[in-house]
């Protein structure tokens, strides 16, 4: 069964989309490779039936986003769910200064997740504690931000573009492009339109908070569109209405690792859980006559099976 890239609509949870896919495909075996918040839209990758076996190898794929960051107003959830619980006047914004500041956020970083998140600490979900009026001391996590580009500063999120097209540089404003849905604005606040490429585990809501802090004001994520997950671009994503008939792509094509073309003997040894000698280094996908045999880790001397397929 296939791997599918779905264009998640606004105000649906990732689990809502999984449930719809289960009904559309007639199976309970559907999983996703990375949660997308209800107030975000864009690429949500689903694995169906036997493809659920590859979820663990896709959860760490890098992701691209368009983000609308509104300055001068903070919220408990760090997004447009509201209510606004902190405000401050925003000083004049110089785009060159902001672009220079954004470079300091690129590369390996330490990031504190939002209180309203599914992170579990001491047996408690952070969002459950937050909704009950409490807080958890969430430790900072190691993340990577590959690139962070300021497209433009706008006087408000209402004034910022909503229509975009895919370009070689990434998704860019285009009056003839695809229209994106954003949450209802919480007010008229100066807004940064950003294009971001990040590693797994990065919270764009936390990034919005931290960008505001660097500029000396509260901030929140006023809108978010995920435009890419791994090799899946939004331009190739299907709508919920087309889920039932969407062909998707096979497991083998979904795995974005170098390939090893196996002999019959190598395939048999891997399926038996052995550690055959091989010069490959790092994670690889092993195939035999176009069929998936195993995902392996190589150290330059031998292969260790991470998962094998019969």
Curated annotation (Swiss-Prot):
Pfam families, A to Z: TruB_C_2, TruB_N
Enzyme Commission code(s) on record: 5.4.99.25
GO biological process: mRNA pseudouridine synthesis; tRNA pseudouridine synthesis
UniProt cross-references to CDD domains, sorted A to Z: PseudoU_synth_EcTruB
Superkingdom, natural source: Bacteria
Gene3D superfamilies per the UniProt record, alphabetical: Pseudouridine synthase
Catalytic residues in the record: 37
Record's catalysed reaction(s): uridine(55) in tRNA = pseudouridine(55) in tRNA
Keywords of the record: Isomerase, tRNA processing
GO molecular function terms attached to this record: RNA binding; tRNA pseudouridine(55) synthase activity
Function: Responsible for synthesis of pseudouridine from uracil-55 in the psi GC loop of transfer RNAs.
Family: Belongs to the pseudouridine synthase TruB family. Type 1 subfamily.
HAMAP family associated with the record: TruB_bact
Name of this chain's protein: tRNA pseudouridine synthase B
């Amino acid at each position: 069964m296939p791997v599918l890239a779905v264009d998640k609509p606004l105000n649906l949870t990732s689990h809502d989309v999984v449930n719809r896919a289960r009904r559309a495909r007639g199976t309970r075996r559907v999983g996703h490779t990375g949660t997308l918040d209800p107030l975000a839209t864009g690429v949500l990758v689903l694995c169906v039936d036997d493809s659920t076996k590859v979820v663990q190898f896709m959860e760490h794929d890098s992701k691209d986003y368009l983000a609308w960051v509104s300055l001068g107003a903070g919220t408990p959830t760090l997004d447009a769910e509201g209510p606004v619980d902190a405000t401050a006047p925003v000083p004049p914004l110089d785009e060159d200064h902001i672009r220079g500041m954004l470079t300091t956020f690129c590369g390996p970083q330490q990031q504190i997740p939002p209180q309203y998140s599914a992170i579990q600490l001491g047996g408690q979900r952070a969002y459950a504690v937050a909704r009950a009026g409490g807080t958890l001391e969430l430790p900072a996590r190691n993340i990577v931000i590959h690139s962070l580009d300021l497209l433009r500063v706008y006087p408000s999120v209402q004034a910022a573009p909503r229509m975009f097209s895919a370009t070689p540089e990434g998704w860019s404003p285009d009056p003839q492009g695809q229209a994106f849905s954003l949450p209802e604005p919480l007010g008229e606040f100066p807004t940064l339109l950003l294009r971001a490429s990040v590693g797994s585990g990065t919270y764009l809501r936390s990034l919005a908070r931290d960008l505001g802090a660097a500029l000396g004001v509260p901030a929140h994520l006023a809108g978010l569109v995920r435009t890419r997950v791994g090799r899946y671009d939004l331009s190739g994503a299907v709508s919920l209405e087309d889920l039932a008939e969407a062909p998707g792509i096979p497991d083998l094509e979904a795995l974005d690792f170098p390939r090893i073309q196996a002999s019959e003997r190598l395939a048999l040894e891997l399926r038996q859980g052995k550690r055959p000698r091989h010069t490959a280094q790092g994670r690889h996908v092993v195939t035999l006559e176009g069929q998936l045999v195993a995902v392996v880790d190589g150290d330059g001397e031998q292969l260790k099976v991470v998962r094998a397929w019969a």
